[in-house]
């Protein structure tokens, strides 16, 4: 028996019994706190002889399949006799109930009071069980890599790879596992104790012991780690895992090493809503009247105030639509959609200059941690379907990172839908070519075409169709670095009929593909339609003008291009335009979309053309400019010091 007690002390101390969440006067759970019913063996019957009565001892069956024999002295109560035996096992009498096993009725027991005189029970067999309403549960550890900044709740040092309890949120390093508190707080049961402190146990009709004082509850909450307090300060409902083995289960395997937490446990679900716990503590401290508690309805929480104690099946069947219904509810803090953090409050952005307006919105220069471009979209009173579709597209746009793509910085949904992007100091390609008439050299024009194809190839690799590719949406940033903007956003670039998204011709007429103008398909936008728009941009680069400049009627252009009667005049291209570039322009603006190349092929063609262009290499005989001064000095020195040769 001393060996068992000594081993149990080692296990308890190894798991940091002194660092438990509750103080010493409250309930402390052992390492394994499932309510394993003690199974008496047939060989145990009849072992109790008259010698036990003469030796003043009582045999006691304890939780977790343990047993002990205690000595009884006159004047001692059950509480005094069993205190030491329970304490060395990490238990407290306030958390347990004691029963006397009836010898005449096998399997039946009668509950005793802890103040009962122990002398009257000499020679009897007693059993100690956990109380049903006591919030005892075990940690549910899972190995986790913390991608966001996190710190160990034990040593308060940086934590990258470690463990985290799925129930209470306790996180720690593997080498700190010996200091983890043994008790994991079951918040649903604590909530019941706070709201119904005078509740009784209805199974046997025997009143339950007095509930824990409110002071202990406050202390237990205040002694939680900082990260756990922050976790339970939000008003959301959490779903965590906790082990729930059968009460008749047995400890068939040895205790695991204390250096590694047990991360393999059967899981069921528990719901936690800590705002109600805080409200209950506050209301209880202000007024302890029953009316203050009864005024709160039972259906304020998605999880409910009270949960009946029903056996949890090993595998719970889920309704077909339960998954989607749960996702539509308030998201837990740890599982919140990451696009939430990309939403910007309208009050944080300061708009200054109106840059211009287009088919789908107005662009402003603004201030939000620096210069940004804010595009307020032309969507009035968006429906919930439009708002959700807009957020879905934003979730795709926020993942774009490329040197030739405008950096997406966030979005706004209050009052108006708006997107916030990187600010480009340079002008658009349209302004350079047709307003300022900047004179680019041919190799510069080819490099602009290459960068544009490179950015579009990246967007298509992300399954993003631009839908409005034109020279107005191509910006030259800090010299000749191409930045493509206003991509995606099919929600804004479509017409909505009720809750249904209906495609319509979008974009500028000169850059619209023939199939987009005709709108014969439900969704005419494709990678090939973007290629056609890119071909018109190539025409602008290589011709220095817009296509169909001789046609002044917009409707005529729409009719002729849609019918296939008109195409860009390739004879207007520059005379020094390479033949490979002329062929590429002709391929991109073909009337049949299946005949157009895709951007990987376009990009490789332009790169091959760049490598084939003749380059002017510096002459090897030309002196370096930074060495010219030294050369002059040497020549002067040579001329002045050369000796005169005698003349014969």
From Swiss-Prot:
Post-translational modifications reported in the UniProt record: Phosphorylation at Thr-269, Ser-338, Tyr-341, Thr-491 and Ser-494 results in its activation. Phosphorylation at Ser-29, Ser-43, Ser-289, Ser-296, Ser-301 and Ser-642 by MAPK1/ERK2 results in its inactivation. Phosphorylation at Ser-259 induces the interaction with YWHAZ and inactivates kinase activity. Dephosphorylation of Ser-259 by the SHOC2-MRAS-PP1c (SMP) complex consisting of SHOC2, GTP-bound M-Ras/MRAS and the catalytic subunit of protein phosphatase 1 (PPP1CA, PPP1CB or PPP1CC); this relieves inactivation and stimulates kinase activity. Methylated at Arg-563 in response to EGF treatment. This modification leads to destabilization of the protein, possibly through proteasomal degradation.
Positions contributing to ATP binding: 355-363, 375
Positions of the RBD domain: 56-131
Residue ranges of every copy of the Protein kinase domain listed in the record: 349-609
Needed cofactors: Zn(2+)
CC cofactor note: Binds 2 Zn(2+) ions per subunit.
UniProt keyword Phosphoprotein present: yes
Catalytic activity: L-seryl-[protein] + ATP = O-phospho-L-seryl-[protein] + ADP + H(+); L-threonyl-[protein] + ATP = O-phospho-L-threonyl-[protein] + ADP + H(+)
Name used for this protein in its record: RAF proto-oncogene serine/threonine-protein kinase
């Amino acid at each position: 028996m001393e060996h068992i007690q000594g081993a149990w002390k080692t296990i308890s101390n190894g798991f940091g019994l002194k660092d438990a969440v509750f103080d010493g006067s409250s309930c402390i759970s052992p390492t394994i706190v499932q309510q394993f019913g003690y199974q008496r063996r047939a060989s145990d019957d009849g072992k109790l002889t008259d010698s036990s009565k003469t030796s003043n001892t009582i045999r006691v069956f304890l939780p977790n399949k343990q047993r002990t024999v205690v000595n009884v002295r006159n004047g001692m109560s059950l509480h005094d006799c069993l205190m030491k035996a329970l304490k060395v096992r990490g238990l407290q009498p306030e958390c347990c109930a004691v029963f006397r096993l009836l010898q005449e009725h096998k399997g039946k027991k009668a509950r005793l009071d802890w103040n009962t005189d122990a002398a009257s029970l000499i020679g009897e067999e007693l059993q100690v069980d956990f109380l049903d309403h006591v919030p005892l549960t075990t940690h549910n550890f899972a190995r986790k890599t913390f991608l966001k900044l996190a710190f160990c709740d034990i040593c308060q040092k940086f934590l990258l790879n470690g463990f985290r309890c799925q129930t209470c949120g306790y996180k720690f390093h593997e080498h700190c596992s010996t200091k983890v508190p043994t008790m994991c707080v079951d918040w649903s049961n604590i909530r019941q104790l706070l709201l119904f402190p005078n509740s009784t146990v209805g199974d046997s009709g025997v009143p339950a012991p007095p509930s824990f004082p409110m002071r202990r509850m406050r202390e237990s909450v205040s002694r939680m780690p900082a990260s756990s307090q922050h976790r339970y300060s939000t008003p959301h409902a959490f779903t965590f895992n906790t082990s729930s083995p059968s009460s008749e289960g047995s400890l068939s395997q040895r205790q695991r090493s204390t250096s590694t937490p047990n991360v393999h446990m059967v899981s069921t679900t528990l719901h936690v809503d800590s705002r109600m716990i805080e409200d209950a503590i506050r209301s209880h401290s202000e007024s302890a009247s029953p009316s203050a508690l009864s005024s709160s309805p039972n259906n304020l929480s998605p999880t409910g105030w009270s949960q009946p104690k029903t056996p949890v099946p090993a595998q719970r069947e889920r309704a077909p639509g339960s998954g989607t219904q749960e996702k539509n509810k308030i998201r837990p803090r740890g599982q919140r959609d990451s696009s939430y953090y990309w939403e910007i409050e309208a009050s944080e952005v300061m708009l200054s200059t109106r840059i211009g307006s287009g088919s789908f919105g107005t662009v402003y220069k603004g201030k939000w941690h620096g210069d940004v471009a804010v595009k307020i979209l032309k969507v009035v009173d968006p429906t919930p379907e439009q708002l959700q579709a807009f957020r879905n597209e934003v979730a795709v746009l926020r993942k774009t990172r490329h040197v030739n793509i405008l950096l997406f910085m966030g979005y706004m949904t209050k009052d108006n839908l708006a997107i916030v992007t990187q600010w480009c100091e340079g002008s658009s390609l349209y302004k350079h070519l047709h307003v300022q008439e900047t004179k680019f050299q041919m190799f510069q024009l080819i490099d602009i075409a290459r960068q544009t194809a490179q950015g579009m190839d990246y967007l298509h690799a992300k399954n993003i169709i631009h839908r409005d590719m034109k020279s107005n949406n191509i910006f030259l940033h800090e010299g000749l670095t191409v930045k493509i903007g206003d991509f995606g956003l099919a929600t804004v670039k479509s017409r909505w009929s009720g809750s249904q998204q209906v495609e319509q011709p979008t974009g500028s007429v000169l850059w619209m593909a023939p199939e987009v103008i005709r709108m014969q398909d439900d969704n005419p936008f494709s990678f090939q339609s973007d290629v056609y728009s890119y071909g018109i941009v190539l025409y602008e680069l290589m011709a220095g003008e817009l296509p169909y400049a001789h046609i002044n009627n917009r409707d005529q252009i729409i009719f002729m291009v849609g019918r296939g009667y008109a195409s860009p005049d390739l004879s207007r291209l520059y005379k020094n335009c390479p033949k490979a570039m002329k062929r590429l322009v002709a391929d991109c603006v073909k009337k049949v979309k299946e005949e157009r190349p895709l951007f990987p092929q376009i990009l490789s063609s332009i790169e091959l053309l760049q490598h084939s262009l003749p380059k002017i290499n510096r002459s090897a005989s030309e002196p370096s400019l930074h060495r010219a001064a030294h050369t002059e000095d040497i020549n002067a020195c040579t001329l002045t010091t050369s000796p005169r040769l005698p003349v014969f």
